[in-house]
Each structure stands twice: as C-alpha cells, then as structure tokens.
C-alpha cells in the first residue's frame, strides 16, 4: 500500500515522499546516487566560449534544484562540497586502490636506485659504527690487533716465552716484570692496564693470549737445538790397531808395577807425533799438583838416576858400534822384562861386553833402578825420537 506522508523542512515547507508497506529510510547516499543518475541522463549543453566562469561547478546547481534538501545538506553544498576525507566519510577500497596505484608505481620508479644502494649504505653505516675512530682500518678486529701487538713486541726485542708468562700474570692480577719498551707496547692497546689491570674475558685479551701462544711455538721451532759447549781442543784420533798377544796378556798386569812398565815397553804404544804434542800442550795442565804424603827426593837419588841414564846411553852407543840391531835388542829386552824369557846368546854376550848383566839377580825385587830397565828406557827414547 502506497501512502503519502508530509514532513516540515527547514524553510517551513513540507517535503512529500511516497512509501510502501515496508518503509525504508532514504539515506543521503541514495539521494546523491539518484541525483547523479538523473543529472547524467539529462542532456547537457556546453557553455559558450565567452561565457563568464560560474562560481560553482555546473553539476552543483542542478543537484540543488533536483530535490528539496535538508538544511545540513544545503549548508554542506554551499560551503564548496568538501571531500569525503575532510567530511569524515571513509574512502571506498576501490577508489583508494585506483588513486594510490599510479602514485605507488611512480614512487617505485624513483626509489629503485636508492633501494639498490641501500645494502651498501647500511653496510658502510654499520662498518662506520663498529670501527673506533682511533684504530687503523687494517687492525680493526681483535685478531689483527693481537697480531700487531705481537709484532711490536718482537720488534722491541722481547722474549715471547717471558712475555707469555707475564701476560698470564696480568690476567690473574699477579706481579709482572716488563721492560720499558714492552710496557709501552701494552699501554698503547691497554691504557688502563696499570690502575685497573686487564679483563681476561675481553675479546682482545683472548685473541692476544692465543697469538702469543702461536708466536712462542713458532719461535721455539725456529730456534736451533741447544748443544753443550764443546772444548776448543780436540783429542787426536788414533786408528785402532790389532791387539797383540803381549797387549792382551798384559791387560791383567796393568795394576801392578811390572804391568805398567810392560805397557810402556810395548811397540804399539809409541810417543805421539809433534802435531799431537802441539795439540795436547794447549790443555791447561797443573804443573804443580799438591804433594801429599810424599817424601822429598834426596840429592843422592837424583844423582843415581842421572848416572844410570848416562850409563845406559853410553852402553847403547857401544852396542851400536858392535853391530847390534836396536829393534832386536828392544824385542829381547821386552820379552825378558815382561815374560822373563831368556835373552838370545849373542845379545847377552854383547850386554856383558858393555858391563850390563843380562838377567835379574832377584826377580822379586824392585827393578826400577836395574841397569836393564835403564837400558830399555834409553833405547825407547832413542827409537821414538
């Protein structure tokens, strides 16, 4: 059922509208859409070229004349139709997307170089913030700084093993002993070392401890092996000679007086050459050893020794004139003195001819001053000269 209802407007006139059984309020948005549809369907005549510009848009008067408006709508239109954003009306999603898409594409074209350079700018900014102002770009990290400290210590002539021990003492807060140059190197990198010590958990301290350990190991590996100091005098080397029956049998007699003289009389033990004498003479020898429990040698003993040597020299000269072979004489004397083997008859007769008895009167007595011993010593000196 269609009915008619009247409502007084702001100017006192009545507005009439038709309604059905299910009345629905007519909103302002619906009226706006209806008015826009009516205005779009009606023919529009373009204004002449010389016509003055109207103070309002062409569609606004038609909208004002299309239907009766409320006082609020009329006031809103007379103020210049503010935008929906200014009036507090939410913007439709389609309009927002349509309006913002061209602007977004334009901004994207303009900002592509900036976005490409953004990672480099962020990296440079992070590097600038991380690097302290006082350090060189080559030694910004803890490990390069630790290697630089070790290099400065080596250039200062420091012993890395000692520095490693002293650095451990610093970290423990114990006493340390450093030279002035070493202390200056540490103060360059640890300014608060003397009053506050060094934090053992800091990154630089850990890196320096590891760098000192590596450098100390490398220095120890490069150092030559320490050998005990050698004597400047070299002992002359003797070629090993085959042991004779005399040497092998006389080994047990070396502790006795007879064995000592037998060792002096053997043919293989000769006096060293002049070169060996020159080398052995360089050794410091105590020419005056302390004499303990020794009786002073009397003048008669010295005279007796000299007389025995003189007699032996004279006897050797006489035997040589008689045609006795000195090597045969030496072998016969050694065999008799060591083994008590009988002296050959021709040599025994020659010895008796020069006044020397060719035998020991009592073999158990001492033979030091016996004429045969003096003759053997003189013969050995003569042959070795």
From Swiss-Prot:
Designated gene of the protein: hopAB3
Compartments where located: Secreted
Region Disordered, residue ranges: 1-61, 73-139, 215-293
Principal localisation: secreted
Quaternary data: Interacts physically with plant cell Pto.
Coiled-coil ranges from the UniProt annotation: none
The family this protein is said to belong to: Belongs to the HopAB family.
A biological-process GO annotation: symbiont-mediated perturbation of host programmed cell death
Something else known: Unlike other effector proteins from the HopAB family, lacks the anti-PCD region and cannot inhibit cell death triggered by AvrPto/Pto.
Keyword Acetylation attached: no
Function: Effector protein involved in gene-for-gene resistance in tomato plants. It is recognized by the host Pto resistance protein and elicits Pto and Prf-dependent hypersensitive response (HR) and programmed cell death (PCD), resulting in host immunity. In susceptible plants, promotes virulence, in part, by enhancing the development of disease symptoms and bacterial growth.
Keyword list, A-Z: Hypersensitive response elicitation, Secreted, Virulence
Gene Ontology CC: one annotated term: extracellular region
Protein name: Effector protein hopAB3
Stretches with biased composition (Polar residues): 245-256, 265-283
